[in-house]
Amino acid sequence: MSVKDQLRLVDRPWAVCVVGPQEVAVTLPYINQVQFISVESTMKLKRAIKVGCKCFAISHYNGELFISDIATVYVYTIAGALTRQFTWETSGDRLFADIRSTCVSSDGKVLYVADKNKGLIAVDTENGIVIFKYSDARVNEVCGICLDSYGNIFICGWSSHNVLQINEHGEYTGETVSSMDTLNYPQALCISRYSGRMCLFRWGDNGLMLDLKH
């Protein structure tokens, strides 16, 4: 991997997601702002919206932004209007405790949330009702999450130093990367829809590029 371009932002960024063919959205949680950046030949700031929370994780589907602070997911339009939020379970308990990253299913019906304290949580994108939860001793402090083109879910464990694969029903299907592979404190991951390769990013270190086999 090599640096193709860089853009200095007005404050510290946290997360990024694709919102168009040549456009991404970046969260700046410490100024409650989402910036939209063109990524054509060079990166350029297009516009920004203010949100009513410390915006950490972000995902996009069909003109909607799923933005989270530590314990709530807020759904905004691309124009910056808040439409709904997910904070509580039907039981009255809090849905989330420490949200680190999110992603949306290919059909837009499910939001997958990586929660450092609670594990993987899947909720309905319309009403926030829990579809499934996944946590076990094989993964600790879930930080990163992504999907492949087959609908498989991949989560990385910060302190378990690994990556697990989960199916769309919330069932464990395997360990993609183990702590024996010298993966130290993974924070984020993504999969290229074109090459099928996984990019893993570790705390205070360079990224890793892995070829996945199906």
Where are each of the predicted segments found?
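Short loop/turn segments that connect beta-strands within beta-propeller blades
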Residues: M1, S38-T42, T77-A81, T125-N127, ...
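A short beta-strand motif characteristic of beta-propeller blades
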Residues: S2-R8, M43-I49, L82-R94, I129-S135, ...
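Beta-rich, blade/repeat-based domains predominating
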Residues: V10-V24, V51-L65, S91-V110, A114-K118, ...
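Conserved beta-strand positions in repeat-built beta-propeller and related beta-rich domains
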Residues: V18-V19, A25-N32, I67-A71, S105, ...
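Asp-box/WD-like beta-propeller blade repeats and closely related beta-sheet repeat scaffolds
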Residues: N32-E64, A71
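Structural signal for beta-propeller blades
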Residues: N32-Q35, V73-V75, G119-I121, H161-L164, ...
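Structured C-terminal portions of repeat-based eukaryotic scaffold domains
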Residues: K118-Y185
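Blade-level signature of beta-propeller repeat domains, shared across WD40, Kelch, NHL, RCC1
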Residues: N184-H214
